[in-house]
């Protein structure tokens, strides 16, 4: 039984070139739905060398206050999709887009691990139930 599956972007699903954190958060936000207000969840968006979307995966779902992200699962999906870049994203149901020290530590750990595989962690984004978000790349925290 598979807990989570890689979602290939279908031919009728628009492939987009992601060049900014705002474009990334808008693209990823569509996968959350109403649960963004209740559960903390984590997704990864996989991109090719031209920063075009090639797939996404929900890698974790927790409770109101947190979720566990296993870097090995992130690496597995990145490798399986042959992605050149990954954007990691999770939400804060509280509505506070500020990264916690744990968010920053996890993002740096993901970046280091993916770099060993020649895969770039392009950003780590925190979404809220409103349109607010934080990009660790924009903050220089990656």
Language-model regions, residue ranges each:
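Active-site-proximal loop/helix of nucleotide/amide-processing enzymes and allied scaffolds
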Residues: 1-9, 30, 48-50, 64-142
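Short loop/turn motifs at secondary-structure junctions and domain boundaries
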Residues: 35-38
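Short loop/turn microsegments at loop-to-beta-strand junctions
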Residues: 41-43, 122
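Short Pro/Gly-enriched beta-strand edge/turn motifs at strand-loop
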Residues: 24-30
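Glycine-rich phosphate/pyrophosphate-binding loop shared by adenosine-nucleotide-utilizing enzymes
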Residues: 54
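Alpha-helix N-cap recognition
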Residues: 19-23
